[in-house]
């Protein structure tokens, strides 16, 4: 997003179109897209099979606000591929999914704190905009104006791949930790592979 350019010493540019792994900006430059919409464009931009499926879906209607059979099919596919998943809830964004997961963890455990890892981004959730990357790390302080410090204080942040720091957090705050949230491959902190174990 435009707001991130200041953290990488770059000037924002605007995309006019994209196809495959290439984007064309508003100035007509043809560029390689190394970002891929932060994940959703894993098949590249505008692949014909995806465009065809979208056109078929749009021909049936643009939105309903209530469940459709295709959502049931998708949920069944998820639970078939991942047998440990017992329930699936459809939401509109990753931010909403994260918010729902945190609320569920806090509601189920009765605990308040969430443990996350430096540089991991979990959507635009106020309590998780702490050490989210794309700039200098903050320790227990919000990364964004308008996020109350109290929200950030409910988020514990430890270095990625540091099992000892996780243990220490649980020794100190374990009775109040509702959940750990982790981005398997942090996108805002360089590219760190998770260590085994």
Predicted region positions:
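Active-site-adjacent loop/helix segments that line or gate small-molecule/cofactor pockets in enzymes
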Residues: 1-17
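Active-site and channel-lining beta-strand-loop segments
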Residues: 12-33
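Glycine-rich loop-to-alpha-helix module at the N-terminal edge of alpha/beta enzyme cores
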Residues: 30-112
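Short beta-strands and strand-loop turn motifs
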Residues: 32-35, 179-185
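Gly-rich Lys/Arg/Thr-decorated short loops/hinges at beta-loop-alpha junctions or inter-strand turns
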Residues: 55-59, 145-153, 181-186
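Alpha-helix capping and helix-loop boundary segments enriched in small/acidic/polar residues
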Residues: 65-66, 92, 157, 189-193
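PLP-dependent aspartate aminotransferase-fold enzymes
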Residues: 76-178
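Active-site core of PLP-dependent enzymes with the aminotransferase class I/II
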Residues: 165-169, 185-197
